[in-house]
């Protein structure tokens, strides 16, 4: 079994402002992070994800309880010791002036350099490795200010990797990225976690991607204890649905649905990829696919050509596209 790198015991997180009552965000948190794992921290807005990430990173103290990093109390470590064990990538955009991407990544070596900050040949080798690990070699000479959000995020991850940490913590690393870049970053993190000497924990609002990619989920509901398990276990137990009760999740297909008034039922005749995407188009438009429904859609394929024949009580129509098919069904439904 993989070794535990990070562990919490009876952890209570929140804020303790001076001269005011403390604010408890979440309590009774007892979790562990194992080598080789990619873990996603999920929860609604306000549940305390960022507070938990900052507490695990040592940026704020817990109200009560303990955080252990490789068996040692996190707050008993020096700043240099902590930086050698834990790499952190935050959501906030950091102003780094005119630094090149290479120079920014090189800052990750500060726990290992002397008072003058000079890099040794070994340090330079680690910096190049970190840049290559995230696929950013072509970005190394460019100014950080010229990079896109996705490119910049790669460089920030490389900077954390240059610390050679046992744990990589990332707070909303895909928050400002488009879908292809989000997938790219999560695939990168999954590959980095595959290194048995490293664990990766990221908080995210991208629920679909977390369900597909995470080895485990940490679910932080707004009114209950943190729960942990494989994505499939948490769906089967109902914990995932309870945590996100304000959105409609279909456990049969493992994805979120738009809540809408049903337009009617349609039977579907066809197979393969065209049938799959036809069913998706129908469901998106509010029509439930049912085997015995009187309204029927038949997929007719002739070599590379495809049409959809719509059979209704008022007659048959042939539609050249799914857009046309949905428009016809909606017209009939409102007639």
Regions found by a protein language model. Give the residues of each.
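Helix-to-loop junction immediately C-terminal to a conserved catalytic motif
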Residues: 57
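The feature captures the beta-strand-to-loop junction immediately N-terminal to the Walker
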Residues: 42-44
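Conserved ABC ATPase "signature" region
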Residues: 121-139
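Conserved catalytic motifs of ABC-family nucleotide-binding domains
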Residues: 164
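Catalytic Walker B motif of ABC-type/P-loop ATPase nucleotide-binding domains
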Residues: 168-171
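Conserved ABC ATPase signature
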Residues: 143-147, 151
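Conserved ABC transporter NBD signature motif
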Residues: 65-73
């Amino acid at each position: 079994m993989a070794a535990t790198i990070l562990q919490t015991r009876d952890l209570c997180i929140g804020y303790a402002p001076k001269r005011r009552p403390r604010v408890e965000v979440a309590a009774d948190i007892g979790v562990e992070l194992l080598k080789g794992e990619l873990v996603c921290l999920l929860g609604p807005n306000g549940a305390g994800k960022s507070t938990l990430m900052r507490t695990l990173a040592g940026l704020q103290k817990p109200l009560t309880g303990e955080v252990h990093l490789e068996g040692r109390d996190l707050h008993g470590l020096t700043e240099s010791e902590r930086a050698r064990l834990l790499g952190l990538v935050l959501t906030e955009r950091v102003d780094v002036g005119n630094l090149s991407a290479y120079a920014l990544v090189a800052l990750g070596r500060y726990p290992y350099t002397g008072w003058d900050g000079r890099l040794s040949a070994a340090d330079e080798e680690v910096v190049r490795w970190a840049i290559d690990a995230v696929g950013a070699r072509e970005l190394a000479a460019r100014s950080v200010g010229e990079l896109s959000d996705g490119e910049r995020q790669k460089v920030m991850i490389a900077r954390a990797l240059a610390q050679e940490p046992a744990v990589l913590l990332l707070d909303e690393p895909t928050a400002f990225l488009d879908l292809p870049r989000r997938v790219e970053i999560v695939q990168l993190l999954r590959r980095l976690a595959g290194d048995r000497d490293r664990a990766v924990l990221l908080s995210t609002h991208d629920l679909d991607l977390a369900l597909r990619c995470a080895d485990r989920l940490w679910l932080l509901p707004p009114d209950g204890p943190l729960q942990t398990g494989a994505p499939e276990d948490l769906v089967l137990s109902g914990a995932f649905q309870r945590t996100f009760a304000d959105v409609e999740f279909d456990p049969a297909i493992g994805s979120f649905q738009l809540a809408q008034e049903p337009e009617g039922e349609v039977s579907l005749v066809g197979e393969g990829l065209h049938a799959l995407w036809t069913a998706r188009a129908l469901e998106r438009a509010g029509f439930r696919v049912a085997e015995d429904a009187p309204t029927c859609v038949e997929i007719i394929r002739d070599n590379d050509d495809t049409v959809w024949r719509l059979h209704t009580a008022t007659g048959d129509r042939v539609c050249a596209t799914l857009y046309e098919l949905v428009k016809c069904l909606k017209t009939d439904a409102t007639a």
